[in-house]
Amino acid sequence: MNNYYKPGPVNASAKVHCRIFTAYVDDGKNQQAQGIYGKFYVNGNYFETHEKLSNSQKTELANANADNTSSTAFCVKNNEVSTKDLLVSLRFPILDDYSFVQSAQDAYQSVLLYAGASNLRDKIDKRIVKETQEGTFTYTGSNGGTNGLIDTQADVEGW
C-alpha cells in the first residue's frame, strides 16, 4: 500500500507500466495444497507517467491510479481465481501497531530526502537520487544490461 512507482529508462514503455502485482495460485509444489492463494489489501499506490508511454498506456495508468484494483494494476495469472477472491477491503490490523504510513507521494519525497548508505550521503547516494529524480542512468551492464540495468557491481562504482 502507498507505493510510488516511477518508470525508469528500461521499463517506461514495457507492458508492466502500471502493474502493482500479479497473483499466482499455488500449484501444489510449495508444501501446501494446490489452489492456495493469498489475500491482498491494495490501496494508495501511485504510478508516475513517462513521456515514452503511449496514450493508451497513459489511460491505463490513470485507471490504475484511480483504482489500484483495476485489471491492469492487479492481475491474476491465468485467471485461476477472480481478483475478488484475493482482495480485502480493509487494512490488515497487524500494520496498526508497527507502521508509519505515508501517502505514496510523501514516501517518494522521504526517499529522495533521506535514503542512502548513511546520514551523510556519499557520491553514489547523490548520483542515485539525481538519476531517480531525472529518470536517467549513468551505467550499463557488462554482459548485455542496458538502460541502467547492470550485470555486476563492477559495472558501477561498487556498493
What do these predicted regions represent?
Residues 5-159:
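Long, contiguous C-terminal flanking segments immediately downstream of a protein's structured core
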